[in-house]
Design a protein with these regions (language model features):
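Hydrophobic/basic alpha-helical segments
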Residues: 1-133
Length: 133
């Protein structure tokens, strides 16, 4: 029964794969992302063994690619933190208060730190402040 296996995959495997993804997702190398996608590809092959194409299996099971799911999860997490002034991590997000026009207000909503290294730029808050600007 593919519905039961799909539910098992989402509840057990996907939840383990995506655990604490805001802490590590943006620091993954392309090789690591490929490995995660390979895990999902194998799982969908178990759920739908007679389907040849990975994209068709994802469509049939209503699953996004794992990297898309993780990126969406991180984006939603950042938005939830940024929109809630009472969130304990909200103070880590720097809002740009020196906005001069409506156009610049949209472009420069967040003020990311000046980072010297790519690793620092790809941390959760720095990456998504740049992403949403």
């Amino acid at each position: 029964d593919s519905d039961g296996l799909r539910t098992f995959y989402i509840a057990n495997i996907k939840s383990i794969i995506s655990y604490a993804c805001p802490a590590w997702y943006n620091l993954l190398s392309d090789t690591d992302k490929t490995r995660l996608e390979r895990i999902q590809r194998s799982a969908t092959r178990i759920v739908l063994p007679f389907s040849d194409n990975y994209e068709q299996r994802l469509d049939h099971l209503a699953l996004p690619p794992i990297t898309t799911f993780l990126h969406t999860t991180c984006s939603e997490n950042f938005t939830r933190i940024a929109d809630n002034d009472n969130h304990p991590l909200n103070s880590r997000i720097k809002i740009n208060t020196n906005r001069t026009s409506a156009r610049r207000a949209k472009i420069d909503k967040y003020r990311p730190s000046k980072c010297r290294t790519t690793k620092r730029q790809n941390t959760f808050f720095e990456f998504y402040m740049r992403f949403f600007n």
